[in-house]
Amino acid sequence: MGAALKMTIFLLIVACAMIATTEAAVRIGPCDQVCPRIVPERHECCRAHGRSGYAYCSGGGMYCN
């Protein structure tokens, strides 16, 4: 395969993985105040609200997987 085709396939796989992660994340309002804190505290808040762990913070809202 050519280098361009390999790169295109790789980028498609990365994009699909990012979409799957983003789509699985759910905003957890009570954890919004934890966004500025360290990552272990974010994970703990998500787990305390029945989720598997911290995904990301965006616009002051915390999203958990």
Swiss-Prot record:
<comment type="similarity">
    <text>Belongs to the diapausin family.</text>
</comment>
<feature type="disulfide bond">
    <location>
        <begin position="31"/>
        <end position="45"/>
    </location>
</feature>
<comment type="function">
    <text>Has antifungal activity against T.rubrum. Blocks voltage-dependent N-type calcium channels (Cav2.2 / CACNA1B).</text>
</comment>
<dbReference type="GO" id="GO:0019855">
    <property type="term" value="F:calcium channel inhibitor activity"/>
</dbReference>
<keyword id="KW-0872">Ion channel impairing toxin</keyword>
<protein>
    <recommendedName>
        <fullName>Diapause-specific peptide</fullName>
    </recommendedName>
</protein>
<feature type="disulfide bond">
    <location>
        <begin position="46"/>
        <end position="64"/>
    </location>
</feature>
<dbReference type="GO" id="GO:0031640">
    <property type="term" value="P:killing of cells of another organism"/>
</dbReference>
<keyword id="KW-0732">Signal</keyword>
<keyword id="KW-0108">Calcium channel impairing toxin</keyword>
<dbReference type="GO" id="GO:0005576">
    <property type="term" value="C:extracellular region"/>
</dbReference>
<keyword id="KW-1015">Disulfide bond</keyword>
<dbReference type="Pfam" id="PF08036">
    <property type="entry name" value="Antimicrobial_6"/>
</dbReference>
<dbReference type="GO" id="GO:0090729">
    <property type="term" value="F:toxin activity"/>
</dbReference>
<keyword id="KW-1218">Voltage-gated calcium channel impairing toxin</keyword>
<feature type="signal peptide">
    <location>
        <begin position="1"/>
        <end position="24"/>
    </location>
</feature>
<dbReference type="GO" id="GO:0019732">
    <property type="term" value="P:antifungal humoral response"/>
</dbReference>
<feature type="disulfide bond">
    <location>
        <begin position="35"/>
        <end position="57"/>
    </location>
</feature>
<keyword id="KW-0295">Fungicide</keyword>
<keyword id="KW-0800">Toxin</keyword>
<keyword id="KW-0964">Secreted</keyword>
<keyword id="KW-0929">Antimicrobial</keyword>
<dbReference type="InterPro" id="IPR038203">
    <property type="entry name" value="Diapausin_sf"/>
</dbReference>
